[in-house]
Every structure is written in structure tokens, then in C-alpha cells.
Amino acid sequence: MFGKKFKKNRYRPRGTNLITSNRIKPDLWRLSSTEAKETLRATGLDVKKIKKITLLKHKICISYWNQEGGVCSGFFSYRIFPTWQQEVEILIEKSPNFKKLQLINHIMEREFKCYPYPLEMEDAIYNALQNRLCVLRAISHETVYDDVGMAREWEYFKPFVSNS
């Protein structure tokens, strides 16, 4: 009866978005009421004043008063907030090499497929990925040329070896 343990989430791929891979930790953010109010208004909600903001691991719970004076609450994705875009752009800018950038690109492709992003935010993140790729290519070309230049300089400093 108790012989075999059940393995929960056995076939679920781990770390497939920015939150579960611990690259972005939105539950540690300090989200202001004005930012939440502006974002909710941009999504089409009629917000008069923010009552309470509760940051959870994968979403945010916001209680607010609407224009009629009624209290409403809802769960919202972090991905609709401008702070999310800033954090993703910082993550992209901090990627030190092609391998890390390729991993972030793969995660972002999945994010764009699975989660609703505002179109402007999606374009800005895509442009940040492209810009970082160009920067990394330029850096790699410089290091290759520096290595070639050092190799050429090194030829002048090799000790003379006679063939006899």
C-alpha cells in the first residue's frame, strides 16, 4: 500500500520561465500604488484608488476602488507592469556571453508564446535582445582581433632558434 512514492510533476520541465528559473524575483519588488493604478487603467480597468497590493510568487493581487465606489480585486500577471520590462532588459544587458543570451532568448520565446505581453513591451524586449546580440558580436570580434594582434606581436618576441 505504501511501497512506491508518487513523484509529483515528474515530466514537467523545470525553469521554463523567468520566475521559476529564479532569474527574476517579482515577489521582492516594491510596487507603488501609482504604477499599479496606471497599469490597470492601461489594461482597461476603471480604477479610482488602490486599496491593497499583495505580491505573490507568480502573480499580484490588487484590491482597488472603482469609479462607482465599489471594492474590486483581482489577480494580475507581473508581465503587464513596466517594472517587469525593466527587469528583463537588465537581465539581458547583464548576459556576459552568447550561451547565456541564447538561454534567455529561448526562455523569452516560450514566455511570448505562453503569456500575454503588451505588444510594445514584446517589441522592446525583442529589440533589447537584438542589441545585446550585436554588442556581444562586436566584443567577440574585438577579442579575436586583439588575440590576432597579440599573436603577431608575440612573433617578434620569440627567441631565435637556429636550425643547426
Label the model's feature ranges:
Residues K5-T83:
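N-terminal accessory interaction module
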Residues E35, K51-H58, Q102-F112, A124-R137, ...:
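Amphipathic alpha-helical segments in structured regions that serve as interaction surfaces
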Residues K59-V88, P118-E155:
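Repeat-associated, polar segments at repeat-unit boundaries in modular proteins
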Residues R79, T83-Y117:
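Amphipathic alpha-helical packing elements
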Residues A42, D46, K94-F98, R110-C114, ...:
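Surface-exposed polar/charged interaction patches
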